[in-house]
Amino acid sequence: VGQNRGAGKMDRVRQGVRCTQFMIWGYSIFAMVLVFFFGKYMTWLFISPSETAVVSAAVTYFRMVFWCYPFLGSIFLYRNTLQGLGYGLVPMLGGVFELIARAAIVYIVSGRASFAGVCLADPAAWISALIPLVPYYFYIMRKTNKAEEKIE
């Protein structure tokens, strides 16, 4: 990203982000299917099958969060793209949004909801982190487009 920006080839940055987003979706769908059908067996790699309560909790967690894997991948994409372009404040702000969302969900649902409710803290955090990242990425790209048009 940084090299392409330095070379003035922002079209490559756009193309890279677009291609990476497709790869994130492809990998996420694969991971969703894997976790949905084999999540219980995957936990057995780390937890004894005799620990049924722990395995059940892990499967519940998997089932609550797997649908948000594309959002998780997108956090890495947009955060690292913005950092590579030289913008550090907004990616850090995304982390703050993530932390606030995680804490808020746990505070709201703990004691009032089940374990499944607490599991929603991660998806809420991932989606919240994207709130400043995605719009800022498109703002930067639009601003760069206008600057490129003035040069031509």
Can you say where each PLM-predicted feature lies in the sequence?
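Alpha-helical transmembrane segments of multipass membrane proteins
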Residues: V33, L77-T81, A103-I108, V134
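Short alpha-helical transmembrane segments in multi-pass integral membrane proteins
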Residues: V1-C68, V109-E152
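Membrane-interface junctions at transmembrane-helix termini in multi-pass inner-membrane proteins
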Residues: Y69-F97
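A generic structural signal for well-ordered alpha-helical surface patches
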Residues: S56, F76-R79, G95, Y107, ...
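A short pocket-lining beta-strand/turn micro-motif at the edge of beta-sheets
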Residues: G88-V90, A103-I105, A116
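Hydrophobic membrane-spanning alpha-helices of multi-pass integral membrane proteins
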Residues: E98-R102
